[in-house]
């Protein structure tokens, strides 16, 4: 793997974009359930998914092709949801099937969506 300032920067920005996506997902969810949009509340809801995201990045070595929809985006998305839900189950937080479905759909749109847009822009550029 070639490491250069450009590839390191791209990976860092991609990881940051993924973090922002998780925070957007959590904020939308908290708002739709009339829960407070506080730093503490968002952090409490987000941390299992952020842990899943980080683990998925490490397990799948997402920094190698951080902007690719496949396989990176798909594996990061699936890992984020699976690990995040596993952590939530482990701490006694909700993992109702409807929540798993909504979380899966919304995070897919966000985590795969920004990558698809980036790929399209890169092809045009």
Q: Language-model segments: which ranges?
A:
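Membrane-helix boundary elements
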Residues: 6-41
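Membrane-water interface at the C-terminal end of transmembrane alpha helices
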Residues: 9, 13, 108-125
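Small-residue-rich segments of transmembrane alpha-helices in multi-pass membrane proteins
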Residues: 21-23, 48, 75-87, 106-107
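Membrane-interface helix caps and helix-loop-helix hairpins in membrane proteins
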Residues: 35-39, 66-67, 92-97
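Structural signature of hydrophobic alpha-helical transmembrane segments
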Residues: 39-51
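Internal alpha-helical transmembrane segments of multi-pass membrane proteins
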Residues: 60-79, 97-104
